[in-house]
Amino acid sequence: MKISLPPYATAEDLQKCMVIVREILDSKAITINDEQCQAITLEVMGISYAKGGDYSSEVIKSFAESYLKIVGI
């Protein structure tokens, strides 16, 4: 399945960001499959881009934590 990356993102950025999202979920003892993790990660990356952020570890971690809190995960 072909995915659409957010602007200026690379496949490497996606993988790096997925690790961050997975670590956050693991710390909450939440298990999801790779497809779900990728969907959440792409959403977080899109939010980061829309807010003027980049795909650095610190920025993605902050947006991911906020996103997961808002959606109730």
Describe the predicted segments one by one.
Residues 39-73:
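Short, charged early-sequence alpha-helical segments and their helix-coil boundaries
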Residues 2-34:
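N-terminal acidic leader/helix
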Residues 1-2, 72:
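Hydrophobic membrane-targeting and insertion signals
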